[in-house]
């Protein structure tokens, strides 16, 4: 063989080998190694015979073109069929070239310029390549020298590409033998899909006759040897690339094998080189396609039946055809994004016609013989029908694989082949190769985790747990308090903080199910607790509304900072109840218990003076109005769960009704912060209250010693008027200190149905210290006979500003208003007598004074010096805090007499005050009871009713008996400290044998049989005459300022 023939061989090899080489590993995977090799050899044999059919037919018919042979054999029909098939084959090949350029070039240039691989970028790249590279080369008329040099470069590149594939197989375990278990050897399902690709891979029939015409000595034998050698080289190349590429990626082979390779310098060079070889090879495909179009459309038949030579075309026609072919194939490359589809479809139709069917038909027509031609014709027709159908039905699968591969190349991931295989229905179980395991250890557990994250969970479970821990561990005003989120406010156990890292929390399915059940339980308890809170609020609102009509039985309670609501304890179990059992100051325990106030009275007192709630400068207001707006919202420092549960109900009751379960974490944190601010404020207020109580306690003990000494000096004075004046002085001396503790204490009593619905006189307690003295009167059943009231027993402890009380039978409000004027007149008449009686009760010397009053009635003015001295002191101390008295329900004009006497006291007119005391003294007002009773005025308590029954205050039995009854009244409050204080009180009183006159402990209960009228006359009116006493089984005062507003 001459040396010139190698140039022809290189041209034939370059014309055969094209983009089909990239699909060889894919064909081996579809058919298996053995079956794919056999089919490749079969296609090589058929390609060789088809080429020889054309050479032999050309030598016999003296024709040198493919179309001329078809016209010689079958006329115009054959000529048109051949030309159409040739045009389709060339266009399909150009489309495949564009697809390869888009696949390889888009990823490379995107990384080079830092862009993202997208469809728009791919379109832009194809348009740029066709406009800048393909079109200039295709417009040249004489390209034979360029084509030969390009063929040499292409063959060198294909050789390098083959060695890269072989080395890649070494890297992926070729010698380890692992691939033997994963590759397929015979797979019949992919036969009809691979045969068209194989047939297209040997499509060199268009180059046969030009090569035969270019020989110096044309002969069939030389052409046979040249094509045999060329096809053997191509077959070897195809088998090498297919086998080693399949071994490298046995489970995940794309139509373009270069897509499977990881991104590195070598593979990028291979991709760019292959892309450039394809781009430069366009003119080799466009040249025959353009000539075929010219002869098909513009060639004219001559008179002798032949056609004019189609070698020359006018410039305009040449340019138009070139533009149509270039940009038409570019549009096809954009619409068909995968190379194996276009190659399979083109090979099954045009390839089978050009390579197999037409040569066999021409040879059979001209030579009239040939068994081989019939076999090749049958195979060609079979491929045309079956392979076309098979290629069209499986078009979508490679498209999905290729699009995913492009995304993986974008992200520079080497683990994408495993994800591609998951979309193939006919593949075996996925097995990872050793080289790919480094970057994929975490892929398998991600899918089950994502399936478990469902429902209201907004983010990963781990992230949510960390947010919950942050919520629980927020800063708090007190270390013992735990701020719980709204969603967990109803838990019946304190939340357990978890700082450790949760291990295997997501892997254990059982734990996840338990968590779901616990969430359902918490939601159910939330709904139940909301209903309980609503049920608790309704009776409290009703009790507050009916507070002016009937006063319920009082239950002894602790001060506001120690309020213990059993209903709230059922909902929340406070983790650290520090203030529940012991008060902050142990020695103040007895005083705090003496200040016990019923819940209803405390509420009304707070409503009456809500404007002064924040005035902590005045200790009296600070104790009267603790910084608690409502008992339902009252927070205990040791009970954070209660805080977080009640505050949202008070503020966002309607909002939480439908959204309590859908609050996001940001809202929970905001609610917790607001609760913490409120809790800090409450704690600061309570600290101030405790400081005030401590100061008052110290002042009381200091004052107690001074009063004891003063009582000893004046103990021998038997004059009743002296004692009364001295009592008045004490009433004026101790208001400033006494109010602070005693103005909070209310009269603990219960009205069955008051005779008159009292027009309650609301007094700002710090304004009139004389009215703030407390006397608790426990009046048992008071029965009314026809003409007198029986008072079998009156337990006098402390009375808060005695006020006229009504009858104890049920009467309507209209009847009460009718007799109101009589009550006012009685109040003005008995003003001074009640003033003296209250002063005596406050100093706890009631019994001693009454005894001396009964035995030694002396003229009121016997010691003017002492009287003046004490009167000045009293008026001086009471004057600074005197303010106008607010009266509810009674007009100010009706109390004119009472106000005149109050003004006399406030202005400090000593002489007038003394004169009033002297003139209004009435020692025996026995008829007062009948006068008030006949006038239907409220029955009043008279201190003189105790004259006979207080003559024996030293009797220990009476003390013990009354003390025992008092303890029975306190059974509702399970407080051991209170019982201990009461027992100590009884022992101290027995030891002193009743000699102690001034004491801060309650005076023993004293029995009274009669002298009811005297008792009512003495206590009928007070200094201001503004407050009223409701007489029933027990005495209780209700202050409600809301009615005045």
UniProtKB/Swiss-Prot annotation:
Entry's localization field: Membrane
Pfam families: Aa_trans
Bias-annotated ranges (Polar residues): 564-573
GO biological process: amino acid transmembrane transport; sodium ion transport
Stretches for region Disordered: 412-584, 606-658
Keyword field: Amino-acid transport, Ion transport, Membrane, Sodium, Sodium transport, Transmembrane, Transmembrane helix, Transport
Gene Ontology CC annotations of this record: membrane
Basic and acidic residues bias spans: 412-453, 460-479, 503-546, 627-658
GO molecular function, one term: L-amino acid transmembrane transporter activity
Membrane topology: Multi-pass membrane protein
Transmembrane segment boundaries: 8-28, 33-53, 85-105, 117-137, 150-170, 226-246, 269-289, 320-340, 342-362, 375-395
Entry superkingdom: Eukaryota
Its job: Putative sodium-dependent amino acid/proton antiporter.
Family: Belongs to the amino acid/polyamine transporter 2 family.
Protein name per UniProt: Putative sodium-coupled neutral amino acid transporter 10
Organism expressing this protein natively: Xenopus laevis (African clawed frog)
Biological classification of the source: Eukaryota, Metazoa, Chordata, Craniata, Vertebrata
């Amino acid at each position: 063989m001459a040396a010139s023939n190698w140039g022809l061989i290189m041209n034939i090899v370059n014309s055969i080998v094209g983009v089909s080489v990239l699909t060889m590993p894919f064909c081996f995977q579809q058919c298996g190694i053995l079956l794919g090799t056999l089919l490749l050899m079969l296609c090589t044999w058929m390609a060789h015979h088809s080429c020889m059919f054309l050479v032999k037919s050309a030598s016999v018919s003296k024709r040198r073109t493919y179309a001329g042979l078809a016209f010689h054999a079958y006329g115009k029909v054959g000529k048109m069929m051949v030309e159409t098939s040739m045009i389709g084959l060339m266009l399909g090949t150009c489309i495949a070239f564009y697809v390869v350029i888009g696949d390889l070039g888009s990823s490379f240039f995107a990384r080079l310029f830092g862009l993202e691989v997208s469809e728009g970028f791919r379109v832009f790249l194809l348009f740029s390549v066709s406009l800048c590279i393909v079109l200039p080369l295709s417009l040249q008329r004489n390209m034979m020298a360029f084509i030969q040099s390009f063929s040499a470069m292409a063959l060198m590149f294909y050789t390098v590409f083959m060695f890269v594939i072989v080395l890649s197989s070494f890297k992926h375990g070729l010698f380890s033998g692992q691939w033997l278990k994963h590759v397929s050897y015979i797979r019949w399902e992919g036969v009809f899909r691979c045969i068209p690709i194989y047939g297209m891979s040997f499509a060199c029939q268009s180059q046969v006759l030009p090569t035969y015409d270019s020989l110096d000595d044309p002969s069939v034998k030389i052409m046979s040897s040249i094509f045999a050698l060329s096809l053997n080289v191509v077959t070897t190349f195809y088998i090498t690339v297919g086998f080693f590429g399949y071994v490298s990626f046995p489970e995940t082979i794309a139509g373009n094998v270069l897509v499977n390779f990881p991104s590195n310098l070598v593979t990028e060079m291979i991709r760019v080189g292959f892309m450039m070889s394809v781009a430069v090879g366009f003119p080799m495909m466009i040249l025959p396609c353009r000539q075929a179009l010219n002869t098909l459309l513009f060639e004219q038949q001559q008179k002798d039946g032949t056609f004019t030579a189609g070698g020359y075309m006018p410039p305009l026609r040449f340019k138009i055809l070139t533009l149509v072919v270039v940009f038409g194939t570019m549009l096809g490359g954009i619409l068909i994004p995968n190379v194996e589809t276009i190659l399979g479809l083109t090979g099954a139709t045009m390839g089978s016609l050009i390579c197999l069917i037409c040569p066999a038909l021409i040879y059979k027509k001209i030579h009239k013989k040939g068994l081989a031609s019939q076999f090749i014709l049958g195979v060609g027709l079979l491929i045309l029908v079956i392979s076309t159908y098979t290629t069209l039905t499986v078009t979508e699968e490679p498209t999905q694989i290729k699009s995913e591969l492009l995304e993986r190349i974008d992200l520079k991931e080497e683990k994408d082949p495993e994800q591609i295989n998951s979309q193939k229905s006919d593949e075996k179980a996925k097995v990872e190769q050793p080289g790919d395991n480094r970057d994929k250890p975490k892929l398998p557990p991600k899918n089950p985790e994502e399936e478990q994250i469902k429902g209201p969970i907004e983010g990963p479970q781990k992230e949510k747990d960390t947010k919950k821990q942050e919520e629980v561990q927020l800063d708090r005003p007190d270390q013992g308090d735990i701020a719980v989120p709204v969603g967990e406010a109803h838990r019946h156990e304190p939340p357990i903080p978890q700082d450790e890292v949760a291990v295997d929390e997501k892997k254990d399915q059982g734990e996840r199910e338990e968590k779901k059940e616990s969430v359902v339980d918490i939601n159910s308890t939330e709904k139940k607790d909301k209903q309980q809170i609503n049920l608790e609020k309704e009776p409290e609102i009703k009790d507050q509304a009916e507070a002016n009509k009937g006063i319920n039985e009082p239950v002894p309670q602790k001060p506001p900072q120690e309020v213990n609501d059993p209903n709230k304890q059922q909902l929340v179990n406070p983790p650290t109840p520090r203030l529940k059992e012991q008060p902050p100051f142990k020695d103040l325990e007895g005083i705090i218990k003496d200040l016990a106030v019923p819940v209803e009275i405390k509420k009304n007192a707070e409503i009456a003076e809500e404007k002064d709630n924040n005035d902590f400068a005045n200790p009296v207001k600070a104790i009267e109005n603790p910084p608690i707006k409502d008992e339902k919202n009252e927070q205990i420092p040791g009970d954070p769960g209660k805080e977080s549960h009640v505050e949202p109900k008070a503020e966002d009751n309607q909002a939480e009704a439908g959204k309590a379960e859908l609050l996001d974490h940001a809202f929970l944190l905001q609610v917790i912060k607001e609760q913490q601010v409120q809790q800090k404020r409450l704690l600061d207020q309570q600290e101030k209250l405790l400081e005030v109580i401590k100061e008052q306690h110290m002042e009381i003990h200091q004052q107690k010693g001074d009063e004891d000494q003063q009582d000893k000096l004046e103990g021998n004075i038997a004059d009743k008027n002296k004692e009364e004046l001295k009592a008045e002085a004490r009433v004026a001396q101790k208001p400033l200190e006494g109010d602070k503790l005693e103005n909070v204490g209310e009269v603990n009593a219960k009205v069955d149905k008051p005779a008159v619905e009292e027009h309650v006189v609301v007094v700002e307690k710090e304004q009139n210290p004389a009215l703030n003295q407390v006397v608790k009167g426990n009046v048992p059943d008071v029965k009314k006979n026809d003409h007198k009231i029986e008072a079998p027993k009156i337990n006098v402890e402390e009375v808060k500003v005695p006020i006229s009380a009504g009858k104890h039978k049920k009467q309507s409000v209209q009847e009460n208003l009718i007799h109101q004027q009589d009550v006012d007149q009685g109040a003005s008449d008995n003003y001074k007598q009640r003033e003296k009686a209250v002063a005596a009760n406050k100093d706890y010397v009631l019994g001693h004074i009454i005894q001396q009053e009964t035995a030694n009635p002396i003229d009121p003015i016997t010691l003017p010096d002492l009287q003046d001295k004490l009167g000045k002191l009293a008026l001086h101390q009471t004057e600074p805090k005197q303010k106008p008295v607010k009266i509810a329900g009674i007009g100010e004009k009706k109390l004119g007499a009472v106000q005149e006497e109050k003004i006399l006291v406030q202005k400090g007119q000593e002489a007038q005050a003394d004169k009033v005391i002297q003139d209004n003294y009435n020692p025996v007002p026995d008829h007062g009871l009948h006068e008030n009773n006949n006038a239907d005025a409220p029955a009043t308590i008279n201190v003189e009713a105790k004259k006979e029954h207080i003559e024996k205050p030293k009797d220990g039995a009476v003390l013990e008996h009354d003390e025992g009854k008092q303890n029975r009244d306190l059974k509702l409050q399970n407080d051991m400290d209170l019982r201990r204080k009461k027992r100590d009180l009884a022992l101290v009183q027995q030891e002193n044998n009743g000699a102690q006159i001034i004491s801060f402990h309650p005076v023993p209960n004293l029995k009274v049989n009669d002298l009811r009228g005297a008792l009512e006359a003495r206590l009928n009116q007070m200094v201001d005459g503004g407050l009223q006493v409701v007489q029933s089984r027990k005495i209780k005062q209700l202050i409600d300022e809301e009615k005045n507003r």
